């Protein structure tokens, strides 16, 4: 879990060819806030700026191509940012490496979604320096700001795609790929509950009471579309990597969520099906 601590992100490129609301929530039509999460130094003297976003929609997943509505400045407009945006809060989604002589300059990510423009400003100010414990805290793994020897000893999972990073598929036909995930088992996952069915139903109907962002710790792998023109369907269905706080959500931020059973050999097999031709980037997160 990103108490793990630093969710590992990997990408697979796929070329697909064609063959013969509630009162105070929003489902569609809202904007996206790009978010600067912080920075960390790299061993070679460079620095990594970390970004995420807040999609104000609960349902709409906008696709925003690199260009006037999705760009970085100064310099290259394309810094590896997503063009497909999952619902709600997505933290520490990608990193941009800047040189050792970056100094006091700003790197700005601009997004214009549903007619509203927002910017995130990245700098090397001391207040934005983060480490694994900060990431764990910000993503809810530590609850209300507590830590333990176990959480401090936790290291990120190691994720490896088996086979080629670039695959070719046909529209409507499944392709399969295997991901190896090696993890230290920390923090320990919550055991399955023996709660009665009636008590479980009451808990599902109870409004959330968390005073800060909180998640259920437990290893999971989630594949999602990062870039691409059409929809991608994954099988088995993936846990959500975004903060779906609804009680019954298939998300670590859902109050009753339980981690899926991890394969003994650490090998996760997933199939993906594409509904439109084009070039895709798939985003894998082990957490």
Where are these regions (language model features)?
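Bacterial N-terminal signal peptides
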Residues: 6-17
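Short beta-strand segments of immunoglobulin-like
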Residues: 36-38, 164-169
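Residue-level recognition of secondary-structure-to-loop junctions
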Residues: 41, 262, 268-276
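Extracellular acidic, Ser/Thr/Pro-rich low-complexity tracts
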Residues: 55-57, 167-170, 175, 181-188, ...
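Low-complexity "stalk/linker" and mucin-like segments enriched in Ser/Thr/Pro/Ala/Gly
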Residues: 77, 82, 200-268
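Extracellular Ig-like/FN3 beta-sandwich strand-entry sites
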Residues: 104-106, 174, 265, 277-279
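Proline-centered linker/hinge motifs at extracellular inter-domain junctions
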Residues: 128-165, 187
């Amino acid at each position: 879990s990103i108490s793990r601590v630093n969710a590992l992100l990997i990408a697979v490129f796929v070329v697909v060819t064609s063959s013969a609301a509630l009162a105070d929530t929003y489902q569609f039509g809202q904007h996206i806030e790009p978010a600067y999460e912080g920075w960390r130094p790299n061993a070679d003297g460079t620095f990594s700026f970390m970004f995420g976003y807040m999609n104000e929609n609960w349902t709409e997943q906008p696709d925003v191509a690199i260009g006037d509505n999705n760009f970085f400045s100064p310099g290259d407009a394309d810094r590896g940012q997503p063009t497909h945006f999952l619902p709600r809060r997505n933290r520490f989604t990608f990193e941009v490496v800047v040189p050792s002589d970056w100094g006091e300059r700003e790197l700005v990510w601009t997004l214009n979604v549903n007619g509203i423009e927002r910017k995130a400003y990245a700098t090397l100010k001391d207040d934005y320096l983060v480490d694994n414990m900060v990431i764990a805290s910000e993503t809810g793994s530590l609850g209300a700001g507590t830590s333990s020897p176990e959480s401090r000893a936790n290291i990120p999972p190691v994720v490896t795609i088996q086979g080629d990073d670039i695959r070719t598929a046909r529209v409507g036909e499944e392709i399969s790929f295997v991901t190896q995930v090696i993890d230290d088992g920390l923090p320990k996952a919550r055991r399955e509950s023996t709660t009665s069915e009636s008590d479980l139903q009451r808990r599902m109907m109870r409004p959330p009471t968390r005073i800060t962002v909180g998640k259920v710790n437990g290893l999971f792998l989630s594949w999602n579309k990062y870039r691409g023109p059409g929809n991608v369907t994954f099988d088995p269905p993936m846990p959500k990597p975004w903060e779906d706080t609804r009680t019954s959500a298939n998300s670590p931020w859902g109050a009753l969520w339980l981690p899926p059973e991890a394969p003994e050999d650490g090998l996760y097999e997933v199939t993906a099906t594409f509904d439109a031709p084009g070039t895709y980037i798939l985003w894998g997160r082990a957490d």
